[in-house]
Swiss-Prot record:
This is Type II inositol 1,4,5-trisphosphate 5-phosphatase. Residues 149-191, 236-304 are annotated as: Disordered. Belongs to the inositol 1,4,5-trisphosphate 5-phosphatase type II family. Its EC number is 3.1.3.36. Residues 669-782 are annotated as: ASH. CDD domains: INPP5c_INPP5B, PH_OCRL2, RhoGAP_OCRL1. The ASH (ASPM-SPD2-Hydin) and RhoGAP (Rho GTPase activating) domains form a single folding module. The ASH domain has an immunoglobulin-like fold, the Rho-GAP domain lacks the catalytic arginine and is catalytically inactive. The ASH-RhoGAP module regulates the majority of the protein-protein interactions currently described. The ASH domain mediates association with membrane-targeting Rab GTPases. A lipid is attached at C990 (S-farnesyl cysteine). Residues 821-993 form the Rho-GAP domain.
């Protein structure tokens, strides 16, 4: 657990705690707990000096009051840090790291917890060392004089020197400079240092080599980094979490609107003991910087407990598993029951659609209704902000308001740490745990999936947080699915999209990402928007009044869809004993009296999946009247696997000993069920899958698809193998799926013939041979991914043309196309574009939410086929599906409507309509025609805005990033560029063409 925040509170202006680690100071036979903090001081000339601050503490270091400064060790040129390990003792994988700190006057020995957090700490120390150059000025450390250390104990035992006892030996090369050690001497040490078990070399401090060398020598295959954190590793277990401590609302007597008397995480906020002039800690700059930061003024309610390793910078230092590590890890998973036991934790899960409102009432009737304080809070919101600014620019002050309201209303009988929060437009999820459990949370990740049109819009979709609690993996999902009673199939599709696209990176970057279903426990909450069907409004209200919930529940769309196993397969929902939570008149308990008069429905739901889960309550909270929804909560007892550390080490040692006895010289070999794969008639954005099975023989083996010489990936961009690597136990097998999917990135080369559906995959066995797999097939050219000028020269459908003609026209340059137009008679715009626009003009000019709702996935295939075959008369699709197909068509253009060459000019004159029109006139004729045609169509839509609810801002936001794309093809527009692009398009929507 990185307790740098507690250290930061003891520092003065100009000092910043980069990182901290909990350790044990070894003095002879005694062991004393110490908190080590790396502190940086910035001098007036922008130079930096560093020192190690050593603190004693009586309890977990959460605030500055919990620690007492014991000793300061400046990082001068004679500073060195090296690992020492007991000679002759059995090396235990995952054991603590023993390091020795050496200066000219001091020698101290510490034990630090095994894990990547300790590695990160050592690397930060390495970077902070002043270097080996004897001509470099030695730091003066005048700033340290303002600190007073505690008086040392009388007759404290002399620290053991690294060579004073025969029981220790060096395992680390020095971190830091030495007046008597040259660069060559350091390099020479690499050849003479012993290469015993667990040796790691970390070079740091060289002025000429700011990057350190990380090389690891493994013990019979190397250290094991288990799939899950080891209980008791309080520092390591928090390296992935984003904590902030909450007072949980203070005492029972404290009013909900009162101010908590705890430290603030707000930059200009103060805790009760801080003077009014106390400065805020400077923003972290190391690899522990938070990824999803809370806003700077989320104040007065939370206090920091530690900093998160939310980004992936630290992963660069994580060792990669070898074959032996994989075997050990596999055996540990198989024998998990030998060293774990089940312990129940109480989870509060809540969901609230707040309809864009600010918090107006205390949330305790919802969040603190139970007598016992929950161990974990999972709190989800939907429709946090309904403004267009939040919709298009993803920024909202409501985030801070609701975060503060939740923090004030947590159960008053406990203190809580905020682990993580994540937001996608109006969908927000907060995760808190009790302070005493914070040390056992790890591997925290947050991800979002938008299911709005083209996956761009975040008005609908899902957010999720995954984490490890002790030895159990948990995923919490908050989703807001498509609205309207008749749109249940779109809701089903939203659910499937969230499940397929929500992926969490693993600590080991070589491992494939985790999906929602790859967790032991899944909690799914949110406004799922499933309605009550086949009953009119009056009948629904009558059944509610009679409390005939079971009769009403039989008509619930979610129940019907789950029973049909189309969604939430394997999930469970508790019995519903409360009245529908939607739709009410805001500020009351009265059903909707608006013109639409929505029928009551259980839109807000909580489901779960996993073992050892008991639901204790499932209810709505009628006391809250801020929104047109009522909040819903569920309390669970969830059995979590907790590691018995002694049994874990015993199991680990048994596994290592058994592997040591395995002397198998056989080369691993496998048999493949299939080696040749043919994908016929591949179409744009239509997934094709082929599978084969790898059967292993008698030797454990690790397999991986490897890159061919001079290639950056193991396969072409349109192909993916799942999984692309893995481990097989003896006599086991695994099925590999080869997925072929052509998208905007690959379609143009396939249309032109520069690329073909042909590839060779190399399947490599660790310590074994390579197997070659042949992939072949044919691609059906499509208007998607074809240049504008190419399509203008195609008077016939693209699938009716010879492949040679399609290839030649696709490879033709824009300038050549313009020159040829004088001799030939091309169309002014692509016929495919006209087909889609004409369809929308005839059927959808008054369609509500056009270009804002996604279409149905199967209908895109139908639309694409109609365009590519020219059978426009057979086109019959949902208006939203055709609208999305139009956007996908524009997105797939290899050269956007406004050519890349004009991109920067367009941004520069985005406020000058006359200059903007002049730029359009300079475009190639086909591009100019398409632009004018689209603007005329969009202006026609705006004439019907009373019915379709479109306005210039919405259309400019949607089409701005499609018509104006950054020349750096894979670079997304930043916010400033995005606004300028929208402003450029906005001019043409409002002005005459």
């Amino acid at each position: 657990m990185d307790q740098s925040v507690a250290i930061q509170e003891t520092l003065v202006e100009g000092e910043y705690c980069v990182i901290a680690v909990q350790g044990v100071l070894c003095k002879g036979d005694s062991r004393q707990s110490r908190l080590l903090g790396l502190v940086r001081y910035r001098l007036e000339n922008d130079a930096q000096e560093h020192a190690l601050f050593l603190y004693t503490h009586r309890r977990m270091a959460i605030t500055g009051d919990d620690v007492s400064l014991d000793q300061i060790v400046p990082l001068s040129k004679d500073f060195m840090l090296e690992e020492v390990s007991p000679d002759g003792e059995l090396y235990i994988l995952g054991s603590d790291v023993t390091v020795q700190l050496n200066t000219a006057e001091l020698k101290l020995v510490f034990q630090l917890p095994f894990g990547s957090h300790t590695r990160t700490f050592l690397q930060e120390v390495a970077r902070a060392c002043p270097g080996f150059d004897p001509e470099t000025r030695d730091p003066e450390f005048e700033w340290l004089s303002r600190h007073t250390c505690a008086e040392p104990d009388a007759e404290s035992p002399k620290p053991r020197e690294w060579n004073s006892d025969p029981g220790t030996r060096s395992g680390f090369a020095p971190i830091g400079g030495s007046r008597h050690q040259s660069r060559n001497a350091r390099r020479g040490l690499e050849d003479v240092l012993p290469r015993g078990p667990g040796y790691i070399l970390l070079w740091g401090g060289a002025a000429e080599e700011p990057e350190f060398l990380l090389a690891e020598e493994m013990h019979e295959g190397g250290p094991v980094r288990g799939r899950r954190p080891l209980a008791g590793r309080r520092d390591e277990a928090l390296e992935e979490a984003d904590w902030e401590m909450s007072a949980g609302g203070g005492s029972r007597e404290r009013d909900c609107a009162g101010v908590s008397n705890v430290d603030s995480s707000r930059p200009n906020g103060r805790g009760p003991d801080q003077p009014s002039g106390a400065r805020c800690p400077e923003k972290p700059e190391n690899s522990l910087t938070r990824q999803n930061k809370s806003k700077s003024d989320m104040s007065e309610k939370v206090r920091s407990a530690t900093v998160t390793v939310s980004d992936k910078a630290h992963i660069l230092s994580v060792q990669k598993f070898g074959l032996r590590d994989t075997i050990v890890r596999s055996h540990l998973v198989q024998k998990e029951e030998n060293y774990t036991y089940i312990q129940n934790f109480r989870f509060f899960v809540g969901t609230y659609n707040v309809n864009g409102q600010s918090p107006k009432e205390c949330l305790r009737p919802w969040l603190s209704h139970s007598a016992l304080a929950p161990d974990v809070y999972c709190v989800g919101f939907q429709e946090l902000d309904l403004s267009k600014e939040a919709f298009f620019f993803h920024d909202t002050p409501k985030e801070e308001e609701w975060f503060k309201a939740v923090s004030e209303s947590l159960h008053p009988d406990a203190k809580y740490a905020k682990v993580k929060f994540v937001r996608l437009v109006g969908i927000m999820l907060l995760l808190y745990v009790k302070q005493e459990h914070a040390a056992y949370i790890s591997e925290v990740e947050a991800e979002t999936v938008g299911t709005g049109i083209m996956g761009r819009m975040g008005n609908k979709g899902g957010v999720a947080i995954r984490f490890q609690l002790h030895n159990t993996s948990i995923c919490v999902v908050n989703s807001h699915l498509a609205a309207h009673t008749e749109e249940y199939e779109r809701r089903n599709q939203d659910y499937r999209d969230i499940c397929s696209r929500m992926q969490f990176p693993q600590v080991d970057p070589s491992q494939p990402p985790l999906t929602i279903n790859k967790h032991d426990v899944i909690l799914w909450l949110g406004d799922l928007n499933y309605r009550i069907e086949e009953l009119d409004v009056g009948k629904v209200k009558k059944l509610v009044e009679e409390k005939a919930f079971q009769t009403l529940y039989a008509h619930d769309q979610l129940k019907i869809q789950v029973a049909a196993r189309t969604i939430f397969d394997g999930f469970t929902e508790g019995e519903i004993t409360f009245q529908p939570t939607y739709k009410y008149d805001t500020g009351s308990d009265d059903w909707d009296t608006s013109e639409k008069c929505r029928a009551p429905a259980w839109c807000d739901r909580i489901l779960w999946k996993g073992k050892n889960i008991t639901q204790l309550s499932y209810q709505s909270h009628m006391a809250l009247k801020t929104s047109d929804h009522k909040p819903v909560s569920s309390v669970f007892d969830i059995g979590v696997r907790v590691v018995n550390e002694e049994l874990y080490r015993k199991t680990l040692e048994e596994i290592v000993r058994s592997l040591d006895k395995m002397e198998n010289a056989n080369i691993p070999s496998v048999t493949l069920s299939k080696r040749e794969f043919c994908f016929e008639n591949v179409k744009y954005m239509q997934l094709q899958t082929e599978s084969f099975t790898i059967h292993n023989s008698q030797v454990p083996c690790q397999f991986e698809f490897i890159n061919k010489p001079d290639e950056e990936s193991y396969c072409k961009q349109w192909l993916t193998a799942r999984p692309s690597k893995g481990f097989l136990l003896p006599d086991s097998h695994v099925e590999i799926e080869l997925e072929l999917f052509v998208n905007k990135s690959t379609a143009t080369k396939l249309n032109s013939g520069k690329d073909t559906i042909e590839d060779i995959l190399v399947l490599h066995l660790e310590r074994g041979k390579d197997y070659f797999l042949s992939v072949s097939g044919n691609y059906l050219p499509s208007c998607f991914g074809s240049p504008i000028h190419t399509l203008c020269y195609m008077r016939e459908p693209i699938l009716d043309l010879p492949l040679k003609t399609v290839s030649d026209l696709t490879l033709m340059s824009v300038q050549t196309a313009d020159d040829r137009s004088q001799l030939e008679n091309p169309m002014e715009i692509p016929k495919e574009l006209w087909m889609m626009v004409d369809y929308l003009y005839r059927n959808a000019v008054q369609q509500e939410d056009l270009f804002q709702q996604p279409g149905l996935r199967p209908e895109f295939d139908h639309i694409r086929d109609c365009l590519d075959t020219g059978m426009i008369d057979q086109l019959c699709a949902n208006n939203h599906s055709v609208a999305e197909a139009l956007l996908l068509f524009l997105e797939s253009l290899p050269e956007p409507v406004i050519c890349y060459s004009a991109y920067h000019s367009c941004l520069e004159c985005s406020g000058n309509y006359a200059a903007s029109k002049q730029i359009i006139l300079t475009l190639p004729s086909f591009h100019k025609n398409v632009f004018n045609y689209l603007m005329a169509f969009l202006q026609e839509l705006l004439k019907n805005s009373a019915n379709n609810h479109l306005d210039e801002n919405i259309l400019a936001s949607i089409f701005g990033s499609l018509l104006l794309r950054n020349p750096a093809r894979h670079q997304k527009l930043d916010m400033a560029e995005k606004k300028k692009a929208q402003e450029f398009i906005h001019q043409f929507l409002c002005g005459p063409l």
